[in-house]
């Protein structure tokens, strides 16, 4: 009951608390995060390519589908832990055998899972990656949607495999037909 205990604190509103790494197959945790979402809070699912069906984790796509079944998809965000450490486990998950690094590609991996395997319409599958995070971080109007006066951050996807074709960042084309044409400061 730790999640609900946090928001019982008079100084913490549900919208101020965003638990992450919540895509676990733990019924009690799922009950709590959905209760938080029903109170107006947001929850974040971690995207990974290597979720073993026998592990304690579920894919971010599976979590999003559970949220949709509970009419709570607009309370879910996805994150990648890009650049963060990801433990690599032995076969029975009893020992860490190495350390990997999270990559942003896992976000697109889970978007494809939602659209191609779970058959969620693209406009709904995009919510945890676009308008939902923009809303909780106070960026609505500038980020998360294509509209006049917004920053014009746009991914153009191939229709058949949802591969990234073009990237527009703040109105400037930075990737054309899959090739980087303008690099950022840290690339």
Where are these regions (language model features)?
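Active-site core of metal-dependent hydrolases
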Residues: 1-89, 94-97
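C-terminal extensions
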Residues: 2-5, 119-123, 177
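Residue-level "edge-of-site" marker
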Residues: 49, 127-128, 162
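Positions that flank functional sites
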Residues: 51, 130, 182
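His/Asp/Glu-enriched, well-ordered alpha-helical/loop segment
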Residues: 68-148, 154-156
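C-terminal cap of metal-dependent C-N hydrolases
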Residues: 146-187
């Amino acid at each position: 009951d730790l999640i609900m205990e946090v928001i019982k604190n008079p100084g913490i509103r549900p919208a101020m608390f965003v638990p992450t790494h919540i895509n676990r197959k733990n019924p009690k945790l799922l009950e709590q995060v959905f209760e938080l979402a029903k109170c107006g809070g947001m929850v974040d699912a971690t995207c990974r390519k290597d979720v073993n069906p026998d592990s304690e984790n579920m894919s971010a796509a599976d979590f999003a589908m559970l949220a949709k079944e509970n009419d709570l998809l607009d309370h879910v965000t996805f994150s990648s832990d890009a650049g963060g450490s990801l433990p690599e486990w032995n076969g029975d998950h009893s020992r860490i055998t190495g350390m990997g690094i999270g990559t942003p590609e896992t976000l697109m991996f889970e978007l494809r899972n939602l659209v191609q395997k779970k058959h969620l319409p693209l406009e709904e599958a995009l919510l945890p990656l676009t308008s939902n995070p923009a809303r909780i971080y106070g960026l609505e109007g500038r980020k998360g949607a294509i509209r006049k006066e917004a920053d014009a951050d746009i991914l153009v996807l191939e229709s058949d495999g949802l591969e990234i074709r073009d990237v527009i960042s703040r109105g400037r084309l930075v990737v054309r037909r899959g090739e980087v044409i303008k690099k950022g400061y840290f690339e």
